[in-house]
Amino acid sequence: MFFIYKRHFLAISLVFVFLYPRSGQLNVGFDIDDTVLFSRDVFLNIPKDKRNPIDYGWVNTHDDGMSIYIEPTVKLINYFFSNGHNVLFITARSGKNGEALATFLSEGLNFPIKKNTNLFFSPSERINGKNHTTKHRIMKRLNLDLFYGDGDSDIIAALKAGAHPVRIVRNDSSISQYGPNYFGNILNGRTKNNPYNREDLNTFYSGSVGMFGESIYPIIWKGPE
């Protein structure tokens, strides 16, 4: 079950049209995990021998039966696609068996999705012991106008690429299972490295503006039954 605040959706859409009037056609990007797909159960069920590092070849072949489409995002994707805009997907998963993910998305979204055509794989780079996003490189190459994602790294990548970032609200059950990369890590409360807690998160939500100044897409998706 979900709620969409149509007035906010229309306002956001109109702002984007006026901001990017070139030909009336936008290049719109979407993250996959916790943005298009509620894929928590896939990652929780990764076999122990495929967890360190994560075997994305296994992950990409197991969305069917485990991942759930986040319906408000699907409706948003359909809005852009049906109005003639270019819809593209960029994930931090690696591309091994990426064709399986493309097939799964094609069946669920009802339009053709192909690896390296409108679905791109952009794994993080490990530098000095920390993972860093590489999505901005693909965003820049694709000349994206907008990018929708749930993670802090998605917002940072969009800003680096010159695209307008829009935060998708992460489901609470995903936050409880995996706190990092979402407004820092609110599960730890306020710390030097993570200055926000759940109270702060609700403040961001109510203002529809995130920690980097990004728009927050006003949806609440209750998650799996």
Give the location of each predicted region.
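Bacterial N-terminal signal peptides that target proteins for export
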Residues: 2-9
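A periodicity- and composition-biased signal for non-globular, repetitive helical segments
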Residues: 12-13, 141
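Hydrophobic h-region of N-terminal signal peptides that target proteins for export
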Residues: 13-21
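Alpha-helical transmembrane segments and their juxtamembrane interfaces
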Residues: 16-17, 45, 160
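Flexible, charged surface loops at secondary-structure boundaries
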Residues: 20-24, 81-82, 139-143, 159
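Alpha-helical substrate-recognition element adjacent to the catalytic core
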Residues: 26-126
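C-terminal cap/substrate-recognition subdomain and adjoining C-terminal extension
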Residues: 94-225
